[in-house]
Amino acid sequence: MNKTELTAAVNTRRTFAIISHPDAGKTTITEQMLLFGGVVRQAGTVKARKSGNFAKSDWMEIEKKRGISVTSSVMQFDYDGKRINILDTPGHEDFSEDTYRTLMAVDSAVMVIDSAKGIEPQTKKLFQICKMRGIPIFTFMNKLDRDGREPLDLLNEVEEVLGIETYPMNWPMGMGKGLKGLYDRYNHRVELYHNEAHGETFLPLDENGELDPSNELTKDSIYRDTLDEVELINEAGNDFDEAKVMAGDMTPVFFGSALTNFGVETFLKTYLQYAPKPAAHKTRDDQVVQPTDDEFAGFVFKIQANMNPNHRDRIAFVRICSGEFDRGMDVVLQRTGKKMRLNNSTQFMADTRETVETAVAGDIVGLYDTGNFQIGDTIYAGKNAVQFEKLPQFTPELFMRVTAKNVMKQKSFHKGIEQLVQEGAVQLYTSYSTGDYILGAVGQLQFEVFKFRMQNEYNSEVVMEPMGSKTARWIDPEQLDEKMSSSRNLLVKDRYGAPLFLFENAFAERWFADKYPDVKLTSKL
């Protein structure tokens, strides 16, 4: 496509992540959006685990069983003239590394908050990553169909705990059994709750911001209370400032109920009016790659094995940062300098996929991977080499020794470990002295998922022996003497062959530093 067509296509893209604490309703709101995009025919299937109707975004077997998202799914659909790429992030804290990387691939975030609980620990963590990146954050206060906290309390908490200004785009008229509707400040109307809407869903407000006096609702005390509260926020609240929203310093707040599909479409439509187009990306040498640059470039932010268990496949997820992707095009893998042809490409609806012929900056494409890619890789098609900024990686804190339960199944054991480690699901270390495999993770759940997937996807039962929490510290190979290793500081190498010590506690690390004052240890990964 020519420059004008490319720019027009890029301008329709909206790529965002949904962040929340577990159980705040993230999966349900995702389902409702897919419903509006005509992608799913039935929403509200998320809770119905016994019926076999699992959430579209929770495709992995363990996610279906436990009802939590443990990997980031990618879903694409068209709505209101925009092409939307939603990245669903794991809500569970043990999967922060996968989530961090996912948040590097989006241009904005939707924060879902349970109106009965307010800000919860995981929401706070994920918010801070978005804040660090300076991306716009839009808030959906969920579960209005149940009794929750006072809306003003919720806004105050967001401002105080997260340090971001709020602007309520609408205001609840009651909650729980007394929910009447939403007073929509932005669209200047009242959106009636399903039970209250007899034929009409939206009622216009007059120039004073009130309903026609002949409407029955005007006699309800909930309506009068809402007018008082709206008057208060009009006078004492923040003014809407689009520049602040774009800088991530103000969050537009929407109320609603994802479960009953109330206020979700209004949110989606309004969000799409303000959500940013694909942003420019910085390279490691401080160059800026614009989305409408002619040459294709993108980076791998996630690798997922066994999206189709029948084929033992691996998919590398690529965020396109500039130009146009065409199936069959030649690109260079920056890390190796190797040329490769991208024949097998796909786009997703969680577990269903279709071959993609073309895509542009802002889109997420999946590339079938035979082991070429690593997380953080840059691929580019132009003459000038491009290398995007490094993706964050975490030093594990928990460690387990892992062996195959059945020694006759070493082949599937090694294949499973290799693939799951390349995904970044766990880190792998090998003992210098014994050759034992040691897994490292940020949280316990990662080990559980690893064990489950080894058995389920690779037919390899594993024995895992806890080693407790350790501190990982890398050492320059030139300074290494294998005699430095002891029971308190185990010498291992990482998957790239770099040596490091696993210290059992801070005391062991201090003792080592005193004994070898010239040796420099780092916590890098």
UniProtKB/Swiss-Prot annotation:
Pfam families: EF-G_D2, GTP_EFTU, RF3_C. GTP binds at residues 20-27, 88-92, 142-145. InterPro entries: EF-G-like_DII (IPR053905), EFG_III/V (IPR035647), G_TR_CS (IPR031157), P-loop_NTPase (IPR027417), PrfC (IPR004548), RF3_C (IPR032090), RF3_dom_3_sf (IPR038467), RF3_GTP-bd (IPR041732). The keyword NAD does not apply. One of its GO terms (cellular component) is cytosol. Residues 11-279 form the tr-type G domain. The keyword Protein biosynthesis applies. Keywords: Cytoplasm, GTP-binding, Nucleotide-binding, Protein biosynthesis. GO terms for molecular function: GTP binding; GTPase activity; translation release factor activity, codon nonspecific; translation release factor activity, codon specific. GO terms for biological process: regulation of translational termination. It is found in: Cytoplasm. Its main location: cytoplasm. Increases the formation of ribosomal termination complexes and stimulates activities of RF-1 and RF-2. It binds guanine nucleotides and has strong preference for UGA stop codons. It may interact directly with the ribosome. The stimulation of RF-1 and RF-2 is significantly reduced by GTP and GDP, but not by GMP. Belongs to the TRAFAC class translation factor GTPase superfamily. Classic translation factor GTPase family. PrfC subfamily. NCBIfam families: prfC, PRK00741.1, small_GTP. This is Peptide chain release factor 3. The lineage of its organism: Bacteria, Bacillati, Bacillota, Bacilli, Lactobacillales.
